[in-house]
Structure formats: structure tokens, C-alpha cells
């Protein structure tokens, strides 16, 4: 059923169209195939929800689903299932008159939990059970809604129904029975029966939950299997995502995702598409962790984890589910008048229909179950933080005990974290998750101790202290995992900065800086000749530099070999040339170019961004001993490779960014000084761009920034793992190793530290720009016509997260906008242009830069986020094929990887040929010109052979 929100915020376009005895009024919700209106029953004036489906938009399968929904709703009569009042069909529409749920859906309820007190029907609930500042709903409210959802699911299960689309958007809410009994303001909602507003379970003073939208439901006995892909991806069971046959246990997964979202405020897994979502689920290895700031009792966490098992046979069974203490037991923590009115009688009777058993409900209300032993708010808090005082022998026997080393939330040795599909910018996503082993290593680095929960008041309980310590570790690990999710990128920034600060402040590295360096030279490490450090110094703040137009000190001369770009950074001239190559195609596509100073012309070009790396590289001019590369040096190479690729992707994103947000007038001028543009014109960000162009540019810039962030994150994770290993081994200072090995370790430590500082600065900068682009995208989407697919009103409900503070909140991207596709197309275009220029012998150095940049882009496309230390890239396409035969990598299937590898190999070949040609030209130009014979003239007489004296 279409998601419905309170009319104050979503009502529009009054209709006032008559359908039978009902009148269609304003729109209150919109789904994929139907629009929901507020309607009025004319004889009684009662409110109904009218789901209007345009038959012309439905194919045969969707029509069949609609008729199935109608038949199912006609046969279901349960207080926690939305009732069907009437159904009318015309030549063009089918109108379903259903119960009106004025509080909207559970998704809206969770999202707006901080504003619920503004609704008069919810004021008392918030007063008694305030919502947590961080996380989801109050534990009492979570248990209340979960009981009512379980009652509806049990009713369906007894009739062999599988819903197949359980999600917060399909869980609708009405005011509590107590509030409706005493409130007489305004028209009432039409009731299917008197029992339809009397809850089977839960608390009378809290809102009542009703399950809706049976468009995908079907009768499926426990022995049958279905194989139709349906439902909402974020809440789909893994077996459905794998296109496997499934049974009723698929609903158990969806219930677990809803419970997790009620507890934490977010789904357990988020991704841009179902392929990436499935990979995240599978790589999570059934380790469901909860954020550190969410406080819930053990039994609630237990049942959530038992729902969220990737294999259906590992999940909790339906009998176990319906008999679980969370479902059958009392709700702890009730206050005030809720204590004696708690309704806890389960609805497990196969014939628990309200219409068939009204007397049972009356007996339940007349003889409430005695209140539990522990009913005070203080006892609830004690249970929340680990003191599980037994309420009754039955409940205590069913309470799981979590002990260190045996927690379902602890990472296992086989964990492989999900990585963001660099191909697709997430609707709600994503920075990449890295390997769990890195998470375990990297979590403690630089994290302030004060961030962990403290339970000093119970330090005298050794057993509880041990449990709490285990919980803290699990929660810290979850923080790191969440930080690598794109929607929680701010936490990742905290981790990146903390780790960089720790390395910068390390006395061991400070001591290592005073040890003389072993003369060595890698063929790929060439710094600027006039720079003692071999690279450019880091400015105090690149953000200030860009805002004020400050120039950086000029450093001349590009490195000797552009081919070394993959291992180290570039000089300013190299970076400018790369930027020039990157923006070349944009001139043709968008008609927008940069001023000369932005493409490297002039003695002191103003840098768009800090070229990589801005830290000391090994001194040039020394020759090494050509020994095999050691492990430390390999780590250095991998970190610098990943950082360099991120720099290329960042440069591509900057092309889009500068078209969206032009430079200030102080920076936007050429060698002749400020141009004659008016300041107002220069600051008009949307000058010359249509709204659709702004949306497209914003989406492209955002996905490229996300890709750059993923590569930066990988560099930091590799450095974090290396740092932890060195801290354990204590070999950075090299005091107990041979001289050359000691010097190598020292140099590796210095270079990794420099790389970490560069990554930290770049990460913060990219994060800030990604947020600016996100805001611009959201604003531009609102300016689109209402009938445009990109307008917020036409976004799918499951992907629509508006008003959040994270980098991707409120972002819905157009289909097909992926980082890989953009990078692949740009690499092809750059290489083709370079090939044309090469054949014409024009701008050969520029051709070399274009080839190199294209190679780095394609390498970034193929980057495997699942390998901290990747295997060496094979020059053979056949060997690369064997390496990626295992399936998809970062959402790219083998066929696509094969195509990219072929293009990559061709460009490498062209680069190799170009370098040979340039070397031949250089040798030819360095040769002295041949000396021409000089002729002597004496008195005008020309010497002849006859005049030559004989020998």
C-alpha cells in the first residue's frame, strides 16, 4: 500500500470525485502503481483511505497481483491488518476503500520521532516513553509494535499466507484506543467493525499498528516454494535476492529488518541495488551488531539476530518466533496507567479472527494478566545495561546469556566486509565496508576512550563488567563498520583523522626522522629537482587556499617519467596537465572550460587541488641495490597506488564540481589579471545551466567523490593494518635490525606517515565537497517539474530519505549514473584523443599524460576493495581473466571486467610505444648537428687535384 503521511504535510490536489457512496478528496500518499486519497463515506461522514489504481498502467501480472490483494483483504479480518471496506471498479480504475490510518506509516513515525510530541494523539506517549536522541524508538514502543506485528503475522501464518513485502512503509498506524475514546474532535475514521480498533496485544494507550499492502502476498503452504522476485530490496530476504526458491521464512527476514530499524532508526543493510545488497548480507556472516548508543535488552537483540540469518534454515522458526518471550511475555518498563491495562494474551489460535471470537477479547479485557514483578523505570534501565533480573522462571529460562567470546555479534575469522559498489552511487550509500580483519585492527586506533560506554556504577559486579566489556568491543566494532557505510561517512572521517593524528604524534616515527636515510632510488620515484624533499610542501589549508585564491609556491620541472605516476605523486605541472586532459572532453560536451590558470599555464599556476603526494619522497639521484622489494615497501607502494588512483578520480570529479560551483572572481582570471566579468555573473552558480543539467552534473560529481572516498578509505585501512602490525612488532625504529633493513623500515614509516597525512586532508576535503554537491542535487531536484522522474514526489518511497544530515540523506540518483561508467567512458575518450594526436605527432607529452590518466582511471574501476594488499596486476589478459573468474568484484561482473582489462591492456601498449617514440625523438634532438665542410678561398683560386702535391 502506498505510504501515507499525515495530511498536514502531504495533502495536495483536492479531488472531490464521487465513487459509489464515497467521495475522493485530497491525495495523501503515492506508491509505485497506485495513489492513495483521503476519502469520505457520504452517509456517515467517516474518513476512509481510497487506493486508486489506474488499470491502464498495469500489465497482466500487476493486474493479477491487484486482484489477489483484493481477494486476500476480503478474507482477512484482524485488528492488526488493514481492513477492506468496499471495492469499486470502473473502466479505467479500481478503487479500494480501506481503513484510514491517520498517523501514516512506521517509516514516517521513525523518521519524525523527534517531532511526534507535536501530534496531540501522541503527546502522552512521548511524555511517558520519550524517544532516544540517537537511534530508533523507545524500547517500550518497539516491543508494543513488534507484538502487534507478530500477532498479524501469526494470523497470516495460520492461513498459509506469505506477505513478501513486510517493511515499515507497509505498517500503518492509527491513534491509540484510549485517545480515540476520549477525543471527539473532527470526523472519525470508518471502522470495519467494533473490534477493528481493539488491539489483540500491546498497550491501549499507544498507537495501534496495522499491516497493509498485500499486493505481493500469496497463499504458500509451508511445504511449497516460490521463486518470484518481489518486495522491497532493502527488506528482501537473501534467498529472494539470489533468485532462489523461497518459502514463508522469507517473511522472517523482513520482520527482522523492521525490528532492527525500529531499534536503531536504520535498516541493517543498505545498498544502491539488490546485487550490492546481497553481497553486503553475505559478507556480513550473520554478525548483526547494534550501535553503541542504542540501549535494548538482551532478549530483543537476540530475536533480531535470529531473524537476520542469511540461510533460511538458520533463522528462528515460526513456532519459536511466536513463543519467544518478546512476543509472549509482558512489556517491561511500563509506567503509570499502562501497568494494569497491559494486554499480553497471545493470538496464536488458528481461528483468532475478531469476528469469530468477540467473547474471548472481552474476557481478556475484563481479566488482565497480573503485572510483572519488575515494573519500575529504574528496573528497566538496569536490565537495559546488562542486569537481567529474572521476572519469572519461564522468561529467565528463555533469556539468552551473552558472554565474551560467544557473542553472535563478534567478528569471525572468515569475515569479509562489503565494499561499496563503486559502480553505483547509493540511494542511501555508501562508503565501502572493508575487511573485518581490518576493522578489528583499525577500530582502536585513535579512538578516544571516552567514546565507549561507561558503567562505573556497576564496577563491583565482575561478571557484568566482563559482559559489558565484550559489549563495548562489539559496539566499537559496529561503529567502525557503520562508519564505512556511505550514509555514516562523518564517523569514518572521525576515524581517519584520529588515526592520522596518532601517526603524526608517534614518538617512534619522530625518532625515526632523525635516522639518516639509506640512499636508494626506485625507478618510479622522481621528485622535483629543485626541491630537497622531492615533493611539494603541504599548505596550511587547501580549503582556505581555494576560497581566497592563494597560490602555492612554484615548483618547476615535471618528473622525469610520467610512467611513475602510478607509484608516486605528480609535480604541479603534471597535475595541471592531468587536469587539462580531464577537462578536455567537458568543453565539447558542456561547452564549459576553465580559465588558463586552472590548466597549468603560467609560471605559478593556482592549483585546483593538492597534487599527490605532498610529502617527502626518497631523494633522487641515488641508485639502490636492486634487491627484491620488502613487505614494508610493498605496503608503501599499495597505499600510494590507491591514493594516486583516488587523486585521478578526484580530478575528474573536480571537473564536474567546477561547472556546478565556479571559482570566486579572485581566482577566475588568467595571466593578464582579473577578467572583465561582473562579480555577480561570476558568482551565479547556475549561469548557463538548466535545472536538468545541474541535476546530472551533481549526480556525476557525487558518485565520483564517493569513488574517491572509497579509494582513500582503502589506503587508510591498509596503513591502519600496517601500523597495528608494527606496533605489535616494535620494528619501526629499526634499532635491532641490520643497517639497510633498518633504513628501509624507517623510510617506509616516513612515507606511510606522509601518505596518511595526505589522505586525511584529501578525505576531509572530498567529504566536504560531496556534502555541498548533495545539497545542490537535492535543491535542483526540487526545482524539476512535478511530472519529471527526478522530482522528489516521484522517487520510490524506499529510497526517499529527506532531511537527514549524512552525506547521502535525501539523495535519489537516476538509474545508470555510476562512477565506473563515467570513468570508463572518460578513459576511452582521453585515450582516443591521445591516439589521434600521437599519430599526428602533436603534443606527445600531453598524449603520455592522457594515456597515464586513462590507465589510472581504469585501474580504479577494477580496484578490488576486498583485498587490502592486492595481488600484482598481470600484464597478461589471460592471467587477469583467471584472477577474476571467481565472480563479481565491486559489482562488476566478469564480462565487464574482461572488456575493461582489454581496453587497459591496449592503452598500456600505446603508452609503451609512445615512450619509445619519445625516447627516439629525445636522443635524436640531443645529438649534435653534423658539421658541414668548410671551403677555403685564397685569392679566388679554387684548389684542384692537379694543384695537390704528390704523395
Swiss-Prot record:
List where Basic and acidic residues composition bias occurs.
Answer: 359-368, 432-442
Give its localization: Cytoplasm; Preautophagosomal structure membrane
Answer whether the UniProt record assigns the keyword Zinc to this protein.
no
Q: Where is the composition biased (Polar residues)?
A: 547-573, 939-951
One GO cellular component term: phagophore assembly site
- Cystine links in this protein are none
Positions of the Protein kinase domain:
22-327
Segment Disordered: which positions? 343-375, 387-458, 514-573, 924-951
Major location category of this protein? cytoplasm
Q: Name one GO biological process term.
A: response to starvation
Tell me, in a sentence or two, what this protein's role is: Serine/threonine protein kinase involved in the cytoplasm to vacuole transport (Cvt) and found to be essential in autophagy, where it is required for the formation of autophagosomes. Involved in the clearance of protein aggregates which cannot be efficiently cleared by the proteasome. Required for selective autophagic degradation of the nucleus (nucleophagy) as well as for mitophagy which contributes to regulate mitochondrial quantity and quality by eliminating the mitochondria to a basal level to fulfill cellular energy requirements and preventing excess ROS production.
Family named by the database record: Belongs to the protein kinase superfamily. Ser/Thr protein kinase family. APG1/unc-51/ULK1 subfamily.
Q: What is this protein called?
A: Serine/threonine-protein kinase ATG1
| Annotated organism of origin | Sclerotinia sclerotiorum (strain ATCC 18683 / 1980 / Ss-1)
Amino acid at each position: 500500500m502506498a505510504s501515507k503521511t499525515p495530511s498536514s504535510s502531504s495533502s495536495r490536489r483536492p479531488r472531490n470525485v464521487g465513487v459509489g457512496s464515497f467521495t475522493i478528496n485530497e491525495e495523501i500518499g503515492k506508491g509505485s502503481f497506485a495513489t492513495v486519497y483521503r476519502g469520505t463515506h457520504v452517509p456517515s461522514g467517516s474518513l476512509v483511505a481510497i487506493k486508486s489504481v489506474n488499470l491502464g498502467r498495469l500489465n497482466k501480472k500487476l493486474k493479477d497481483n491487484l486482484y489477489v490483494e483484493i481477494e486476500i483483504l476480503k478474507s482477512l479480518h484482524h485488528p492488526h491488518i488493514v481492513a477492506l471496506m468496499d471495492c469499486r471498479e470502473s473502466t479505467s480504475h479500481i478503487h479500494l476503500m480501506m481503513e484510514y490510518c491517520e498517523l501514516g506509516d512506521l517509516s514516517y513515525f521513525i523518521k519524525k520521532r523527534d517531532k511526534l510530541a507535536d501530534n496531540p494523539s501522541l503527546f502522552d506517549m512521548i511524555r511517558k516513553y520519550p524517544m532516544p536522541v540517537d537511534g530508533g524508538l523507545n524500547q517500550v514502543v518497539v516491543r508494543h509494535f513488534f507484538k502487534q506485528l507478530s500477532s498479524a503475522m501469526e494470523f497470516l501464518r495460520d492461513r498459509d499466507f506469505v506477505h513478501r513485502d513486510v517493511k515499515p512503509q507497509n505498517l500503518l498506524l492509527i491513534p491509540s484506543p484510549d485517545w480515540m475514546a476520549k477525543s471527539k474532535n473532527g470526523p472519525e475514521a470508518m471502522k470495519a467493525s467494533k473490534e477493528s480498533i481493539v488491539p489483540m496485544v500491546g498497550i491501549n494507550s499507544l498507537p495501534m499498528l496495522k499491516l497493509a499492502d498485500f499486493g505481493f502476498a500469496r497463499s504458500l503452504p509451508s511445504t511449497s516454494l516460490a521463486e518470484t522476485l518481489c518486495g522491497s530490496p532493502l527488506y528482501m530476504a537473501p534467498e529472494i535476492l539470489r533468485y532462489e526458491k523461497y518459502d514463508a521464512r522469507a517473511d522472517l527476514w523482513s520482520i527482522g529488518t523492521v525490528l532492527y530499524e525500529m531499534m536503531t532508526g536504520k535498516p541493517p543493510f543498505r545498498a544502491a541495488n539488490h546485487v550490492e545488497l546481497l553481497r553486503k548480507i553475505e559478507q556480513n556472516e550473520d554478525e548483526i551488531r547494534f550501535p553503541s548508543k542504542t540501549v535494548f535488552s538482551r532478549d530483543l537483540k537476540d530475536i533480531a539476530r535470529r531473524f537476520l540469518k542469511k540461510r533460511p534454515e538458520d533463522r528462528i522458526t515460526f513456532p519459536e518466533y511466536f513463543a519467544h518471550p518478546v512476543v509472549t511475555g509482558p512489556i517491561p518498563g511500563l509506567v503509570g496507567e499502562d501497568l494494569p491495562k497491559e494486554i499480553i494474551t497471545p493470538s496464536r489460535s488458528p481461528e483468532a479472527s475478531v469476528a469469530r471470537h468477540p467473547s474471548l477479547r472481552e474476557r481478556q479485557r475484563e481479566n488482565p494478566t497480573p503485572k510483572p514483578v519488575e515494573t519500575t523505570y529504574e528496573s528497566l534501565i538496569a536490565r537495559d545495561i546488562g542486569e537481567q533480573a529474572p521476572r519469572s522462571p519461564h522468561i529467565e529460562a528463555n533469556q539468552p546469556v551473552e558472554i565474551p567470546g560467544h557473542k553472535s555479534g563478534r567478528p569471525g575469522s572468515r569475515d569479509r566486509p562489503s565494499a561499496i559498489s563503486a559502480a553505483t552511487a547509493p540511494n542511501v550509500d555508501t562508503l565501502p565496508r572493508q575487511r573485518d580483519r581490518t576493522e578489528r585492527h583499525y577500530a582502536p586506533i585513535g579512538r578516544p576512550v571516552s567514546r565507549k560506554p561507561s558503567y562505573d556504577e556497576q564496577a563491583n559486579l565482575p561478571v557484568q563488567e566482563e559482559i559489558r566489556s565484550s559489549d563495548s568491543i562489539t559496539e566499537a566494532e559496529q561503529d567502525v563498520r557503520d562508519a564505512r557505510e556511505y550514509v555514516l561517512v562523518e564517523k569514518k572521517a572521525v576515524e581517519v583523522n584520529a588515526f592520522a593524528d596518532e601517526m603524526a604524534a608517534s614518538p617512534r616515527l619522530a625518532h625515526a626522522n632523525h635516522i639518516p636515510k639509506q640512499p636508494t632510488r626506485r625507478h618510479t620515484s622522481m621528485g622535483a629537482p629543485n626541491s630537497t624533499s622531492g615533493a611539494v610542501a603541504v599548505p596550511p589549508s587547501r580549503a582556505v587556499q581555494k576560497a581566497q585564491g592563494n597560490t602555492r609556491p612554484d615548483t618547476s620541472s615535471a618528473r622525469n617519467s610520467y610512467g611513475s605516476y602510478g607509484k608516486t605523486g605528480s609535480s604541479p605541472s603534471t597535475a595541471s596537465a592531468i587536469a587539462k586532459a580531464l577537462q578536455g572532453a567537458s568543453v565539447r560536451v558542456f561547452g564549459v572550460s576553465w580559465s588558463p590558470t586552472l590548466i597549468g599555464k603560467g609560471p605559478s599556476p593556482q592549483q585546483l587541488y593538492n597534487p599527490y603526494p605532498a610529502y617527502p619522497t626518497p631523494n633522487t639521484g641515488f641508485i639502490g641495490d636492486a634487491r627484491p622489494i620488502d613487505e614494508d615497501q610493498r605496503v608503501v607502494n599499495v597505499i600510494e597506488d590507491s591514493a594516486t588512483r583516488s587523486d585521478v578520480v578526484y580530478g575528474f570529479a573536480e571537473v564536474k564540481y567546477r561547472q556546478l560551483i565556479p571559482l570566486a572572481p579572485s581566482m577566475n582570471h588568467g595571466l593578464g589579471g582579473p577578467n572583465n566579468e561582473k562579480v555577480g555573473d561570476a558568482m551565479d552558480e547556475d549561469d548557463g545551466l538548466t535545472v536538468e543539467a545541474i541535476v546530472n552534473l551533481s549526480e556525476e560529481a557525487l558518485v565520483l567523490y564517493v569513488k574517491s572516498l572509497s579509494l582513500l578509505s582503502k589506503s587508510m585501512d591498509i596503513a591502519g593494518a600496517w601500523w597495528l602490525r608494527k606496533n605489535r612488532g616494535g620494528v619501526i625504529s629499526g634499532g635491532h635490525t641490520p643497517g639497510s633493513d633498518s633504513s628501509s623500515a624507517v623510510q617506509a614509516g616516513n612515507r606511510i606517515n606522509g601518505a596518511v597525512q595526505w589522505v586525511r586532508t584529501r578525505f576531509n576535503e572530498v567529504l566536504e565537497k560531496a556534502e555541498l554537491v548533495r545539497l545542490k542535487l537535492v535543491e535542483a531536484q526540487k526545482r524539476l517539474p512535478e511530472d519529471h522522474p527526478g522530482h522528489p514526489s516521484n522517487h520510490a518511497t524506499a529510497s526517499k530519505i529527506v532531511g537527514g544530515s549524512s552525506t547521502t540523506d535525501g539523495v535519489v540518483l537516476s538509474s545508470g549514473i555510476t562512477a565506473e561508467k563515467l570513468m570508463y567512458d572518460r578513459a576511452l575518450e582521453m585515450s582516443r584523443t591521445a591516439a589521434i594526436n600521437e599519430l599526428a605527432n602533436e603534443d606527445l607529452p600531453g598524449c603520455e599524460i592522457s594515456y597515464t590518466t586513462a590507465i589510472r582511471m581504469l585501474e580504479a574501476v577494477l580496484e578490488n576493495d576486498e583485498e587490502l594488499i592486492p595481488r600484482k596486476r598481470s600484464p597478461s589478459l589471460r592471467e587477469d581473466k583467471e584472477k577474476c573468474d571467481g565472480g563479481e568484484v565491486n559489482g562488476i561482473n566478469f564480462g565487464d571486467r574482461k572488456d575493461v582489462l582489454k581496453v587497459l591492456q591496449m592503452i598500456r601498449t600505446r603508452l609503451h610505444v609512445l615512450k619509445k617514440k619519445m625516447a627516439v625523438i629525445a636522443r635524436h634532438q640531443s645529438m649534435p648537428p653534423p658539421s658541414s665542410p668548410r671551403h677555403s678561398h685564397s685569392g679566388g683560386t679554387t684548389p684542384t687535384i692537379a694543384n695537390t702535391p704528390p704523395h
